[in-house]
Amino acid sequence: MKKTFVALVVFLMLCVAAVSAKSSGLGSLGKNLSALSRNAKAAEGTVPEGREILPAIFAVMYSDGSGSEKSDGIMYLSKADFDAGTYTVSQKIIMKGPLGVLQRQDSEIDISVNESQFSVETKKLATCNSDKNGNPKGDWIEATASGKSKLNKILADEISRNLNLSDKEYAEFENKAYTDFGVLQSVASTSSNKLKAKLWFKKHPVEKKSMETKVLVSSVDESKAENYAYKVSCLYVPLDKKLDPVIVNYYSNNDEVIGFKPDSLVEIKGKISKINFDEYSMTYKISSIDIEE
């Protein structure tokens, strides 16, 4: 799982509040903090010409961060509306607090783009004591407006830096962003009409681009496609539950795929050879994606 220094900085700040609340027996602290969290200040930045916000967001999500061995978490794009230019990044992280107490932090951050300007606004930032699996134990403590404002500023600064990466570094995250199956499915789901979705895919061609993702195996069969021995029929299930699963056809000559069991979750790597669209759908819905190892 990926960690970011952003998560750890804010997480440590909230750990102090959660531990203090528990040790002091302040049962109403959560409500008081919620009341203080309503007026957080959004942070803003500029999108340079020739760059787009999504690769910069993915650069935040896939950064290795502080390298702390005491934390574990995941940061992912939970929602994307390409027509509106709005994106939501969600995060869950488990870490030991100052007194050695395991705690979990959940956050949801909205990032919106209007022409060449972007803004970052934290909608949720809360901490609670937890077990080793992240199951909550006790009350959630919502961050103050000050805490959320600090996170907004940290993330906006990080996104701005990522928007000005070298061409080589930017291209790496551009590839990650636009070959992400959740992103591809979101385009079809959120576009107001087919033509807008078609235009997006025309501007962001993904065929022959490298990708890797985790999929749920349905079956492994002999391939009828030329140059490949096996066809693995899979299903990609987006983290955003509002999106439909995507059928994935994975073509390989690797004998190891024979050992893939139905309903098992496996990681596949390869190049996108074709995206198949449902031309009869009201939206530009993806019917399946073909991947070649």
Regions found by a protein language model. Name each.
Residues 51-59, 83-92:
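Short, hydrophobic/aromatic-rich segments at coil-to-beta transitions
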Residues 65-67, 94-105, 239-243, 277:
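Short, cysteine-centered beta-strand-loop-beta hairpins and adjacent loop/turn segments enriched
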Residues 155-293:
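OB-fold and OB-like single-stranded nucleic-acid-recognition modules
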Residues 32-71, 136:
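Tryptophan-anchored aromatic micro-motifs
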Residues 1-4:
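Positively charged n-region of N-terminal signal peptides that target proteins for export
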Residues 8-16:
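Bacterial N-terminal signal peptides
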Residues 101-128, 268-269:
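A short, surface-exposed beta-strand/turn
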Residues 19-23, 42:
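Boundary at the C-terminal end of the N-terminal hydrophobic targeting segment
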